[in-house]
Amino acid sequence: MSTYLIGDIHGCLDELLALLAQVNFDPQQDTLWLTGDLVARGPASLDVLRYVRSLGPAVRMVLGNHDLHLLAVYAGISRNKPKDRITPLLDAPDADELINWLRRQPVLQVDDQLKLIMAHAGITPQWDIETAKMCAREVEAVLSSDSYPLFLDAMYGDMPNNWSPELTGLARLRFSTNALTRMRFCFPNGQLDMICKDTPENAPAPLKPWFDLPRLVDPEYSIIFGHWASLEGKGVPEGIYGLDTGCCWGGDLTLLRWDDKRYFTQRAFKAEAEINNNNGFAAGEAVQH
């Protein structure tokens, strides 16, 4: 029984299957953690969702910003962009089933036995574990409810960007969603900066990566995140693991075997990397919420 953690898949099914074959993944015995952004940019978003769903309880995943964007597109709230390559998913006969499964997935995973926390973008320095759990549950509750289109319509926006327990309603949900799925940089007080998408060494002062600020999360817990492909998994402190290594941009799909902290990688298949890089958008470009 092994625990495997994999970074953002972005519709790259062939690379995912090749990577799982490297470690002889057995869904009957092993557990697979996924950092979110299962869909968009790669060629096989539909088949990725079908495959991950078929794994049932063997999977512990979180939603990423591209997954939320897919939900918004399917609900008629956001526009389907050709570069996301999700039209086959939207037109699939089982699209309703897949979308309803996807919107019931969590935005946060916490395992108290393994001392593991996973969120697509990370954990804001303004939250401790209990606050993160509470805010994640609130987002998950509205996503799984019949009123989820109202939330999806309101989630786009960068404000508020400063946590307060006094936040309520859609403003509170938007902050939580941004913190869990879009965050990269923070100001020294922990306030989110939703504009800069550069590498840490090129970010303007006083911005710092969220993981370089003092955190309220119990240091016994390790934090797993994806989302930030340009990091290439490097430059993070001990106990923080960035697993998005840009497979859909021609980089790697990365797996971390938690039992012995050993990394495995699968290089992107060249043809797909060329398609994305020739479409005129930068590696790691994010969906704008």
Swiss-Prot record:
It catalyses: P(1),P(4)-bis(5'-adenosyl) tetraphosphate + H2O = 2 ADP + 2 H(+). SUPFAM superfamilies: Metallo-dependent phosphatases. GO terms for molecular function: bis(5'-nucleosyl)-tetraphosphatase (symmetrical) activity; phosphatase activity. It is an enzyme of class 3 (hydrolase). Keywords: Hydrolase. GO terms for biological process: RNA decapping. Its EC number is 3.6.1.41. GO terms for cellular component: cytoplasm. It comes from the Bacteria. InterPro entries: ApaH (IPR004617), Calcineurin-like_PHP_ApaH (IPR004843), Metallo-depent_PP-like (IPR029052). Signal peptide: none annotated. Hydrolyzes diadenosine 5',5'''-P1,P4-tetraphosphate to yield ADP. PANTHER family: CYTOCHROME C5, PTHR40942. Belongs to the Ap4A hydrolase family. This is Bis(5'-nucleosyl)-tetraphosphatase, symmetrical. The gene is apaH.
